[in-house]
Amino acid sequence: MKMSNKKVRSSGSKGIAFKIILLVLSSVLFWLSNPNIIFEDGIGWLAFLNYLPLLFLIKKSRFSETVIFGAVYGVLSYALYGYWLNTFHPLGLIIVCIGYLIICSLLFTVLKWADVISSRNSWLLQFLIICGYEYLKTLGFFGINYGVSAYTQWKNIYLIQICSLGGIFALNYIVIFPSAFLFSLISKKNERNRLLNHVDNARKSSISAYVKKEKALSDTSLKLTFICGALWLALFTASYIYGISVMGKSNSSRFVTIAAIQNNESPWKNGIEEYSRNVNKLIQLTEEAQSLSNEIDFVVWPETAVAPSIIYNYDYGTDMRRFLLISQLLNFIDENNAVFVIGNSHETELKNAGRTRYNSALVFESGKNVHPPEPGIYSKIKLVPFTENFPWKHTFPYLYMKLLNGDNHMWEQGDEYTVFDYRGLKFSTPICFEDTFTTICRRMVLNGSRCFINLSNDSWSKSKACQKQHLAMAVFRSVENGVPSVRSTASGVTCVINPNGKIIKAAPEFCEAYVIGRVPVIEDGYQTLYTRTGDIAGTLAAGLSALILIIQTIVVIIIKTRK
């Protein structure tokens, strides 16, 4: 009896250890497949296996265990992936980890429930659930696109062209499916061998053994698995062929030349001396770029490159040093032939409301809107949760003060998807991580934009992995909508991206630099299929998986009730 108990305990310990190995392996695959501290570009092909150990973990775990494993997976995966958040504020990383602790606990629970109610081909339902989860996690106030599987393929230039048809979440089907396919193949083969061995070892009549063997073969049939695998292979091949066929095709015969400036400045430095030094550095880098080319049509400065509000300090400011700095800047712009796109902390003053501050892009053109400053303005719409926007500041005032991190207030939210039209180029200016959101950039293109000029500041992260993660997502906005992108960042990554998502030119990280590139002027009438239809692939995965779950649950309840 004692020996039996020891064997049970030993078996249980081995089982837990194996589950922990599967859990850690899942998190490590997720981490390594994305840009990370070891591999700056990520190991993209690992993403095709990301969910394989996770599905085995779900299969081998009890319901109570899945909740715990899901929580640990969420914390471990996003702590490894987003470690750079700690540089901004430790609270930022803690909030993300807590968020994914809850989200992944729910995900694992739903995946386990799918395994229970759909035992024969639960892998297909689980595949849809995972695709739906990766779409749903990008929505709402807490929604972020960081960690979506398909973004790992950002260097796979031919494969990602399929996004012009179905978007990032269509590519997600292709990337996630191999994990589900291999899980089905391995688990069904193992289960078949187990059942057949059990039948052979049991003392049954030949007829009974035959019936049981047939049932075992039926329950573990791989027919559907191979059919789905063949369909995936056909889709994968077709996507590559499509990608090869569209590469190099151009929808434009006209170009403009854009200089994107990278000033490599820390966002934490404040004070008029620091502001003046930074503006002078930006002017110097601009002059250096223009000395190399007299054909520059646009000059782009990064997010909040000019910290003092240009319009407010010119019209209402009482600080003479700030006024003189703004006047110096405006004089430089007015004497310049290029259109300037400048990141600015834009302030307005409303009656009975005081001053409000926006994270904005201001567009100036010499002789038209410089003196007095009346630039075109776009104010950031999607603010970073908890760091730029916290809607519960009156409910949780202590947490709000901690999140301010030494600042005195957060940004106000913009409300207009502005499209600028200068020198024949219609463009929009998604700010910071706005170019990671499919819906924002698609809305801009539907409004008439034919180029994204992104203003960012990832220098605070002090992490190349963070900057590459951001760049990886920006690449897809060009592919999805068939328009070029220009990114001007304080650091990470300043570059020019063509409509196929190919990075034409890029500046090295963490240094003062600039990139000069020719950008095609896309025709007004041109829209990709994705631009016209949106994230149908993501909505379909979420809706279909929810519908099947509900139907299967009802069927299980009915069957149990009848018994």
For each feature predicted by the language model, list its residue ranges.
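C-terminal luminal/periplasmic domains and tails of membrane-associated envelope-modifying transferases
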Residues: 294-295, 389, 484
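Short beta-strand scaffold segments in enzyme catalytic cores
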Residues: 359-363, 418, 492-497, 515-517
